[in-house]
A protein has these predicted regions:
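RNA substrate-binding interface of SAM-dependent RNA methyltransferases
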Residues: 14, 41, 69, 74-168
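Structured adenosyl-cofactor binding patch, chiefly the S-adenosyl-L-methionine
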Residues: 68, 106-110, 119-136, 192-231
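Short, hydrophobic beta-strand segments that form beta-sheet elements in well-ordered domains
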Residues: 2, 22-24, 142, 160-166, ...
Length: 231
């Protein structure tokens, strides 16, 4: 995959991700010295290209002048190893890349054990997702799974499923040691199978008549409440 932009490339280099090569626009090299130094420390090959040629390869509207070829893919449920107490943030067909990236960033910041992207969710490796995650995907376990596989994993590993639903009460006391908070699609919400498997439905109290919250915002509030109850 390709990581583009000074911040994202530096995050990949600092997180120890396998960066195979860097491409730098010739006119931007002087402004990218910290990135070039980090690449040199890692022994990463750096190629230079004229600005016009670089811009043709870049995906952003205003390219900053650096992109990296990175070997990174989400993990599978078989790769997940949970401690005695662990919280997972699970995305059920969340389709907006900005929401997916924001949720990964939130899960990392709040100390979740992993973010799980169920089938129908935007590709966690897409550039827009990685950019919204602000490098968190390189430091925080991100898993792709079909619902059936995750449900089997949860059952086998004593992971209780909590479903984020509009109009429900916020997380209360009595959090299980292992917990998966599942947030649904921006429009359709959670699939019926998730609701059927959920031990509890939780939500964010809102004023009457208020529009529903953005999926990433609701996830951040609920995950904070869940994690706060663990301390």
């Amino acid at each position: 995959m390709v990581a583009e932009g000074r911040r994202l490339v530096m995050d990949a280099l600092e997180a120890g991700v396998n960066v195979k090569a860097l491409l730098v626009a010739e006119d931007a090299a002087g402004q990218l010295q910290p990135v070039l130094e980090a690449a040199a420390r890692r022994g990463v090959t750096v190629e230079r290209a004229p600005r016009r040629a670089f811009n043709e390869l870049a995906d952003t509207e205003t390219p900053s002048g650096v992109l990296a070829v990175v070997e990174w893919r989400p993990k599978t449920v078989a790769d997940l190893s949970l401690g005695a107490r662990a919280t997972l943030l699970v995305l059920d067909a969340v389709q907006d890349p900005g929401n997916v990236g924001g949720m990964i960033r939130t899960a990392y910041a709040l100390g979740a054990a992993a973010t799980v992207a169920l089938d129908g969710t935007a590709d966690p490796g897409a550039h827009k997702v990685l950019r919204a995650a602000m490098g968190a995907a390189f430091r925080h376990p991100v898993v792709e799974a079909r619902w059936a596989d995750f449900a089997a994993f949860a059952q086998a590993n004593d992971v209780a499923i909590w479903a984020a639903c509009q109009g429900r009460e916020p997380p209360a006391e009595g959090r299980p040691d292992r917990l998966a908070l599942v947030v649904g699609n921006e429009g359709a919400g959670l699939r019926p199978e998730v609701l059927a498997a959920a031990a509890r439905q939780v939500g964010v109290p809102m004023q009457p008549g208020a529009e529903s919250l953005n999926a990433a915002t609701a996830a951040a509030i609920l995950l904070y409440e869940v994690m706060r109850g663990r301390h």
